[in-house]
Amino acid sequence: MPIVTVLRSLRKCAVVPSLLLFLLVAPRPIRAQVSGNSQPQSSPADTSKASTKPQTKNPSLRGPQAKQPAAGATLEADQQRQVGKIYYADGHVDVHYENTRLRADHVEYNEDTQVVLAHGNVQLDYLTQHVEAEDARYEVATGRGSFHHVRATFAVQRRQSPTLLISPNPIYFEAETADRINPDTYKVHKAWMTVCDPQKPTWKFYAPEATVYMRDSVHLENGNFRLFSVPVLYLPYATFPAEKQRASGFLIPDIGDSSSKGLILGDAFYWAPTDWADFTIGANYYSRRGWSQRADLRMRPWENARLDINYNGVVDRGLETSTGTINQGGHEAKLLFTALLPDGWRAVADLDNLSSLTYRIAFSETFVQAINSEVRNAAFLTKNFRGFSLNFAANSYKNYVSATPDTFVSLRTAPEARFSSVDQAPWEKLPIYFSFDAFTGASHREDTVTGFQTPNFVARTEFAPTVTIPFHFGPWLDVTPTFTFRTTYYGGQLQNGLYVGNGFFRTTEEFSLDLRPPTIERVWGDSTTGKRWKHVIEPEIIYTDVNGVKDFARFVRFDEDETLTDTNEIQYGVTQRLYFREGEGGTQELVSWSISEKYFFDPSFGGALVPGERNVFQTTDNLTPFAFLDQARHFSPIVSDIRVEPGRHFDTQFIVNLDPRHGQLTAIGELVKWKPYREYFLTVAHFSVVNLPTPVIDNPPNFDFEPRSNQVRTLIGYGDLTRRGFNSTFGVSYDLSRGSFQNQIAEVGYNGSCCGLGFEYRRFSFGSIRSENQYLVVFRIANLGSLGTLRRPEKIF
């Protein structure tokens, strides 16, 4: 190397040679530089630092690049000498080249080939790579090299994931030999690797041949997975991600046990052909039931576009009962597509295909999935422009009434085109706002409980212009009248409960008057601490009059539009809010409490109400989702909704319906979320609907207005399944009205820096369809995945 520095060992004992060297190289006090084709001007005995920056007389006549010294390389050592084109360095040898640093006890550097031969305590550092070896051959210019008896650490960056245990440790491996193909690729032989403590690794991979692609993946050939140094899984070929990149291959197998499914064994294959798409296909074997299939496709074909497809199915041999076997097999497929299209258009498709409710109850992995009796499908193309909205849509809704027998109510509106506008004022100085809503399409209804069914396409068209005129009387009163003229055409109707294809028009005049009295508020606080509170009281009064519906019984119930009735009513209520602010920080709403009630001047709703039956109208559903109309009445239940959110550690909501007619609470809903300390959490939900039959004289035989429901769900725990340390979760769902448990869950686990072990017990109890106990064990491997059936945190709510 042409650049040399004074030996550290000579700076103390060779004062005269040092002074002589200073005089010889005064322009560069501690360096001397020569061209790549000339001999150094100073004796090797008087030098200790070399550089490979050449001086050429004619840059255009340079020889082949591979034969030139590496530009910018420096070498430091306790002792150096040069023999021809080879530099010999001993003692604390330190070679620097760009972002690479090579250290060793002894180094031989060939100026022509730019090859370093290093022996003894070899260490290579490059960015996040650290390699230690007994000896090495390293090419300075290309970064290629060979190392023997290697120990190395590669730091990687992994994003936090709710389903994957992430280790802060680097990838560590030991190998007999390692070939550095380029700065980002290593080919290792007879190696083992882990992210655990290398002194006591809980797990490690061993492979005769392996390739490490930095910021990509690690490939193993004919390897095995070892737990406490004991081989437990043979891997003819395996890959796992080294950082953020994905790698195709077989996933870690599924293993579990279930009282109804028996022994569970399965696996899946993951394929990532591009950086914007991946596909997973897998299957599980159930020793008592049959086998299941699953497939997942994820695509991001262009910016602001997303496609997710999920399929799961079971080929079932049948559930054994005292009367024989019951086949509960089936499938469910879901598709979600969203995309922003040119010219301001947006496309969305959210589709769900379910073979039967029995299948969902019997084979759903979580309690929340199992109790969902609805199947929704929606697809639309929409564009918003200058206050207008144009939509083309197809929607369907299916609600299963029972699983055995399989009965349901199915509604469909497809195709449908809708054009609407927001409130717009055509005159700048007149506060008169116009809007409209118009649609045309076809509808269908099927009810397997009663056997009722309409033709596949029943025409339905509507046009509804609206005029709104707000008045502001200073800060004391806001009055907003709204007028709507709605005309709707139906291609069919009901006559004596049967469908007939006689079309008709429904024309209604709708008027509402929104009165907002002045808001009452009070602000107080402590000037010394900067804490301030604000209490606000917001009263509201809304009068509504609708007429023109007539003969409510002839409407086929396609959706909520057909629950519109004549009404003459007033709604009144008050909302209280408590705000808090500290210093210049943001304002937080601590408490909100809303109370409202309706008074019906026409208790028969234009003759729509049928005494002794459960009546659900648009006006009552806007107040509360709990039905209360069983006969004519003037007052609705009083609806109270309280929300308390005093910070990140506590959140609660309490909803009640107080029926003044019966003098009792008819519906109760409570939700409490509490994080009292650090990682502890508690969630409690309680929902209750009181069965209120009408007087016997008005009831049909065996009439039940609203089935009694009283359920409580609780979830308590510490931490989460991918958090380091001890974690636990316990949950229960209990039906108070039936006195039985529907679901129980208990999860306990511990995660270290490189792996974790978890145990889970699940209990599903859904009558004769499913009574199952599951015992699950999972071994989590940091940065890779998990071995077992507990793949992700389960949620009850």
Model-identified regions with their sequence ranges:
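Compositionally biased, proline/threonine/alanine/serine-rich low-complexity intrinsically disordered stretches
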Residues: 30-71
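Gly/Ser-centered flexible loop/linker motifs
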Residues: 61, 66-71, 80-88, 258-264, ...
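Structural recognition of beta-strand segments within beta-rich domains
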Residues: 74, 80-103, 108-119, 123-130, ...
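Outer-membrane beta-barrel proteins and related beta-barrel translocases across Gram-negative bacteria
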Residues: 129, 140-193, 198-209, 213-214, ...
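N-terminal secretory signal peptides that target proteins for export/translocation
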Residues: 1-11
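Interaction modules related to DNA damage response and DNA replication/repair
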Residues: 58-77, 90-106, 119-133, 149-166, ...
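Bacterial N-terminal signal peptides
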Residues: 14-26
